[in-house]
Amino acid sequence: MSKYLFVYHAPMTPAEATPPTPEQMEAVMGEWNAWAGKVGDGMIDFGTPLAGGVRVTRDGVSPSTREVVGYSLIEAADFDAALDLARSHPHLNMPGGCEIEVHEAQAIPGM
């Protein structure tokens, strides 16, 4: 089993989006919870919404060029299994062209 970081991208942060009605929020959270149930014991960290990212370099700090709106950390049998979970993720159904990046955690030699 390997660990995978899911990075959620969207054209706007949750705070910038039109607030959902309570019914819409309940439906969306139901989809996310159903997906988490599919991940099962492989869910290491469900994650949280993110906003206000910046890019830090030796030259200074600047606004992030890509909006990261959340993350999850999961464990899956292999990269293909992680991709299958990403393909079925409800984040992809959100309006505005939402995306998920999948990154495999790499072991650090000697640690």
PLM segments and residue spans:
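Conserved, structured core segments of small domains
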Residues: M1-M111
